[in-house]
Every structure is written in C-alpha cells, then in structure tokens.
Design a protein with these regions (language model features):
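Conserved NTP phosphate-binding and transfer environment spanning the P-loop NTPase/kinase superfamily
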Residues: 50-182
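Glycine-rich phosphate/ribose-binding loops and adjacent secondary-structure elements
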Residues: 29-38
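Short gly/ser/thr-rich secondary-structure transition/capping motifs
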Residues: 23-30, 80-86
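Loop/turn-to-beta-strand initiation segments
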Residues: 13-14, 40-44, 99
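A short, aliphatic-rich alpha-helical micro-motif
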Residues: 38-39, 94
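Generic detection of short hydrophobic beta-strand segments and adjacent strand-loop junctions
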Residues: 13-18, 37-38, 166
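Switch II (G3) loop of P-loop NTPases
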Residues: 44-50
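Conserved nucleotide-sensing/catalytic segment adjacent to the nucleotide-binding pocket
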Residues: 1-29
C-alpha cells in the first residue's frame, strides 16, 4: 500500500494495478481481475478492519485478553511482534492518510455477530461454485481472537485520533456522528 500511495501522488503518474481481494478463498483475485487506475485519483478511500490501529504500551501486552492468547502466546511473542509492526511499518503507512473515519461498533461481540453473518452470506453466494474457504462459527471466533486486542485498543484510542467517528447501531446504521476539527 505504501507503494500505491507513492505512485498515486507522483506528478509522473502511470497507470496502477490495484489488487482485489477474494474473501471466499481468503486471497487476492488473479491479476487479470485487479482494478486498473488510469489517472491520478483525487481521493483514495483506504478501508479495513484495523486501519489506523496504534501500538499499545508494553505493560498492557502482559495480560492475556482471551483464550487464544492464554493458550498460544504465553511468552508474548505474537503480541510483541504485532505491536512492533504497529509502531513501525503500520505507523508509516497510516501517516499517508489525511483523514481518518472510524466506524465504531458498540462492542467486540457485536463485531463477531456481524462477521458470522458475513460468512453466512458469503457461503450462500459461493456454495454452488465450490472453491471457497468459508469459516465455521468456531473458525470465526478463533480468527477474531487474533484481532481482539487491536480492536479493543481501537475502541479506546481511535476516538482521540479519528477526524470523524461514526457510532453504529446493531444494524450497521449510523446512530451518531462526531466531527472533529484539527
């Protein structure tokens, strides 16, 4: 993405291929299905579950927050690695953003519910095609535990850093919006 941002800002803009993600197989589509951008964009919307996430203090990493961390990361290897990535590579990436819009759900369990619904819809859409990696309920819960720490940290920190906070209700609708001036 850093390369994409660099190319998109270049005065000597050349066309850019932008990867397209295929959630059904948990990987990118083949290059022939990628988007081609032929002229420099005026606006880029870069979205993702943990876009804008910030590192935690080393002290907060010590306490396990779910069963996955308790069972599989007793020595904090994964937590420290992720935190280091947030302090370095992702901080550099997020510095490219001019405005941060945070879509804030009520809590983590609501996000799990939404993800389960999303997987079910994906299964309905792809069940006849055969090639898919649709997750079971247990798979979704395990998968989401790997992002739980980052997500809960975002619940606390993003309202301080985001330019716009859109508080969502349980039906994905905007309940309230907070606009902050710089």
């Amino acid at each position: 993405m850093l390369d994409f941002f660099k190319k998109s800002k270049s005065k000597k803009f050349k066309k850019i291929q932008l990867p397209n993600f295929n959630k059904a197989v948990d990987d990118r589509f083949p290059k022939n299905k990628w988007n081609v951008i032929n002229q420099r964009p005026d606006v880029i919307i870069f979205e993702g579950w943990c876009v804008g996430a910030r590192a935690e203090t080393n002290k907060t990493l010590k306490k396990s927050i779910n069963s996955m961390e308790k069972a599989n990361d007793q020595k904090l290897i994964w937590r420290r690695f992720v935190n280091q990535q947030l302090k370095t590579k992702y901080k550099k990436l997020y510095s490219q953003l001019n405005c941060m819009i945070y879509l804030k759900a009520k809590n983590f369990s609501l996000l799990q519910k939404w993800r389960l619904k999303q997987e079910h819809k994906l299964w309905l859409k792809t069940k006849k095609k055969g090639a898919h990696k649709i997750m079971s309920k247990g798979d979704v819960i395990n998968f989401m535990q790997t992002y739980q720490r980052i997500t809960q940290n975002m619940f606390k920190k993003m309202p301080k850093y985001a330019s716009i906070i859109l508080n969502l209700n349980s039906n994905h609708q905007i309940k309230t919006a907070v606009y902050k001036s710089k």
